[in-house]
Regions:
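Glycine-rich phosphate/adenylate-binding loop
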Residues: 2-13, 118-238
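A structured beta-alpha segment of the ubiquitous adenosine-cofactor-binding alpha/beta core
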Residues: 91-128, 134-138
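Hydrophobic/small residue at the entry helix of a nucleotide-binding pocket
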Residues: 50
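N-terminal charged helix/coil linker that caps or initiates catalytic domains
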Residues: 1-43, 177-179
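Conserved S-adenosyl-L-methionine
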Residues: 60-65
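Glycine-rich phosphate-binding loop and adjoining beta1-alpha1-beta2 segment
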Residues: 68-105
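Hydrophobic Val/Ile/Leu positions in short beta-strands of Rossmann-like dinucleotide-binding domains
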Residues: 44-47, 68
C-alpha cells in the first residue's frame, strides 16, 4: 500500500531552496548541488535505527522527495537508537510517526509511505535517484537490490556491535549484493547495536547519498568497513 503524506507546503515553482535555511551547507557545496538535492527522490527501506537517522539528515538537507518503507511497531529496545521515536510512541506504527516528525522538520519535502515488507510482491517506484538500504536482514536486502531500477544508485549500510559498513552499487553496472555477501549468514537472535555506531554509519550513508546525487560516488563497488574498537577504517573492492 502506498500513501502520500501531505506535509509539503511548497508553492508552485518553489524548489524548497531558501538561502537562509540552507546557508551553512551552501557554503560547502554551493547552489547547484543544493538544487540536485532539492530535486532528488530517495527511497529509504526501513525506518528503524539507520533509516530514522538517514531520513532525518536527508530532510534537514532539503531532499525533494522521500519514499519510506516499513511495517514495524515501536518497542522499548528501539529507543536506544531510533531517533524519531520516544517513550509515548511504544506500540505505535513507525511509518506514520516518522512521516509526521520529518514533516515537522522540513515541510518542503514530499513524503510517500509504503507500508509493508520488501518481498516478491513489492512494487518499486520508478522515479528514484537513489535507494538507501537500512534493512536488518540479508534476504530483504538482496531482494531490494534486485528490484532497484536500472542505473539507480543503491547505498547499503549495515552494523553489528562496534563494526559498520557502507557500500554503493549501481543497478545494471555492479554485481548483485547477493553475490557480494553470498556467504553471509543472518545472526540468530537480536543484533547488538549501540547508538553511537548507528549515527556514524548513517552519517556515512548520507554522505555517500549526497555524493551519488552530485554524480561523484566515492564508494561505488567499494565497501567501507569501520571498527570503533580502534577507529580502524578499511576498504574492500567488490
Amino acid at each position: 500500500m502506498v500513501m502520500w503524506w501531505p506535509c509539503s507546503h511548497r508553492e508552485p515553482g518553489d524548489n524548497g531552496l531558501t538561502t537562509e535555511r540552507y546557508a551553512r551547507q551552501l557554503l560547502h557545496w554551493g547552489e547547484e548541488n543544493q538544487q540536485r538535492i532539492s530535486q532528488a527522490t530517495v527511497l529509504i527501506a526501513g525506518v528503524g535505527g539507520l533509516g530514522a537517522m538517514v531520513s532525518q539528515l536527508l530532510v534537514r538537507a532539503g531532499v525533494g522527495r522521500l519514499y519510506l518503507v516499513d511495517d514495524g511497531i515501536i518497542d522499548w529496545p528501539d529507543l536506544n537508537r531510533q531517533v524519531l521515536y520516544g517513550e509515548k510512541d511504544i506500540g505505535c506504527g513507525k511509518l506514520q510517526l516518522a512521516s509526521e516528525r520529518l514533516c515537522a522538520i522540513n515541510s518542503a519535502t514530499e513524503i510517500f509511505l509504503i507500508e509493508g515488507r520488501i518481498d516478491e510482491d513489492f512494487v518499486m517506484p520508478t522515479d528514484l535517484n537513489a535507494v538507501a538500504d537500512c534493512l536488518d536482514n540479508y534476504q530483504s536486502r538482496f531482494l531490494l537490490d534486485e528490484l532497484t531500477p536500472q542505473g539507480v544508485f543503491f547505498v547499503h549500510g549495515g552494523l553489528h556491535g562496534d563494526h559498520g559498513q557502507v557500500l554503493t552499487l549501481q543497478s545494471g553496472k555492479s554485481q548483485p549484493l547477493a553475490n557480494i555477501f553470498a556467504g553471509a549468514c543472518q545472526p540468530k537472535g537480536d543484533i547488538p547495536v549501540t547508538p553511537d555506531n548507528v549515527v556514524i554509519v548513517a552519517g556515512l550513508m548520507v554522505n555517500e547519498l549526497f555524493a551519488t546525487l552530485f554524480g561523484e560516488p566515492k564508494l561505488l563497488n567499494r565497501c567501507l568497513v569501520i571498527s570503533l574498537i580502534d577507529f580502524h577504517i578499511s576498504f574492500l573492492d567488490v
